[in-house]
Amino acid sequence: LVAPAVWGRVTMPWYQRWLLWLGAHTVPWVTVTGRGLGITPSDNIEMLIELGRDPLIIKETRIGAIYGLVNLMDAGLATAGDLKVPALILYGKKDEIIPKKTTRLMLKHFNNKPRVALYEGGYHMLLRDLPAATVWKDIAHWITNRAAPLPSGADKRNIKSLLGADE
């Protein structure tokens, strides 16, 4: 799971939950963008610019669609413990999209112990960030030999910094 989208309502402040519910039930057709939020999804600026120019990329999202996405993230977070197969969880320490608090809660839900890799310079779009080749190599290595350490050492990094307090 790369930067798992598990930002469920249980970890959202009350005002975000309230505004989402109100918007979805009164004006679900209204669209919003991420402009002005000051969030950086990746360090690969060239790729972000290309995505912004791509006519096939959704740049405005209906509030009703966001409500549905949050429903999916609620389900993902609530059922993380149901995963019975080996898992590799990849998270960028600079992820500004999915809060550490949410990822921490997801990891606590797992019944089995997934392998967790923390990429110090990684953002939310780990597979498109500038050091994406490192992440891809780790995934390929894990697929072929789940018991061996990842080549980057990301699974040996201070995971407690991910599991600790929010910054």
Language model features: what each stretch is:
Residues 59, 94-98, 125:
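Acidic catalytic loop of the alpha/beta-hydrolase fold
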Residues 1-64:
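Alpha/beta-hydrolase-fold enzymes
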